[in-house]
Amino acid sequence: DAPSSKQWFPIEGITHEQAKNSVMAIRDLLVSSKTKNEFLYKLELNFDVYRSVGYDNDGTVLFTGYYSPDFYASTTPSKRYNAPLYTRPSDLATDPASGQPLGRILSDGSISTWPTRREIRLSNLFNGNELVWVEDDLDAYTIHVNGSARLRLDNGELMYIGYAGKTDRPYTGLGSSIIEAGLLSQNKLSLRNIRRLYDHDPDQINTLIDRNESFVFFQEYDGSKWPAGSLGVKVTAQRTI
């Protein structure tokens, strides 16, 4: 029922309510079906099945895995935990329907563009808004890109954090920047190899991280509902797409 979902409807005569009811009906069918054949039979009997237009309007669809990483962290800074993740600032403006960032609300009520990631980092703009600290800038950046994480705190507790908004600056992938810099080839690009590059020369990788001007904010999540997909429902390992 989120506005970001309703904005896409109606489409091809299908209302948001119909789409919502269909998802719930398929969920019930999955629970009640005793065999694969029973599920497929009732699916064909009771549903109209559409092929996605894809991102190119020609049926091309990309399915990706949902990454739910663990990181070590602390609610207080230290020599080990020195890379902060920040809560959403009160002057962040977003579109109420889509959730997309609009900019920064100024004192006169106007909206301007946020500073870049590098400018934010150098100015310590969000000092006092820290939610938690992780071990280094690459861990923090990885969580920025992923949008959520499970944190193993130094006191032994678990903390779950997730996306709470971002600035209106453009996104540039670290992987593409590393390839352009000649540090890795396309077939060698992986988080493990990026970690090796960072451990060898963190300043070099931080410079490439700064090319991504977008900056993400976080909030603490209910661990029983983490990680949640786009529908706000907890995803299932090896099943959810």
Describe the residue ranges of each PLM region.
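Secretory/export targeting leaders with adjacent low-complexity proregions
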Residues: A2-G229
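Hydrophobic alpha-helical bundle architecture
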Residues: L231-T240
